[in-house]
Amino acid sequence: MSIITKMILNADAEVRYLTPGELDQINIFVKSSQRRLQLVEALTQSRATIVKQAGKDIFQRFPRLVAPGGNAYGENMTATCLRDMDYYLRLITYSVAAGDTTPIQEIGIVGVRQMYRSLGTPIDAVAESVRAMKNITTSMLSGEDASEVGTYFDYLITNLQ
């Protein structure tokens, strides 16, 4: 839920108009929207590189994943892991666009730990693959942009563990 929606819902629940402070926060949010959209575009354009490099990193750090019997063993299973990584990167872009973690929480986190456990997928490796994408992504961005995007990766990592 965006900051604007939260403020409107809070004001409505309290049967009041938006306060000057809330209007200032909305103004800041609106002014930052162009930068957030540029970040989303940059991440979207770099997604193949981010996922490929992060996959290479995670498979080197966790060779058991691609070894016979591992969750990413074989071409199809490796592709499935990379697909999941791309999915999480897409959720990050949704949250950057929204300026809020709601897309990660509502689309990506609900039930994911249970699903991975039932499939025998090591959640630590999933969290580490997201961390690898974070490291690659933030190294491509400047300070403030890297910090903002990193916040959403950290939120996802924390909720996967």
UniProtKB/Swiss-Prot annotation:
It is a peripheral membrane protein. The keyword Chaperone does not apply. Contains one covalently linked bilin chromophore. Keywords: Antenna complex, Bile pigment, Chromophore, Electron transport, Membrane, Methylation, Photosynthesis, Phycobilisome, Thylakoid, Transport. The modification N4-methylasparagine is found at residue 71. One of its GO terms (biological process) is photosynthesis. SUPFAM superfamilies: Globin-like (SSF46458). (2R,3E)-phycocyanobilin binds at residue 81. InterPro entries: Globin-like_sf, Phycobilisome_asu/bsu, Phycobilisome_asu/bsu_sf. GO terms for cellular component: phycobilisome; plasma membrane-derived thylakoid membrane. Belongs to the phycobiliprotein family. Component of the phycobilisome. Heterodimer of an alpha and a beta chain. Light-harvesting photosynthetic bile pigment-protein from the phycobiliprotein complex. Allophycocyanin has a maximum absorption at approximately 650 nanometers. This is Allophycocyanin alpha chain 2. It comes from Microchaete diplosiphon. The gene is apcA2.
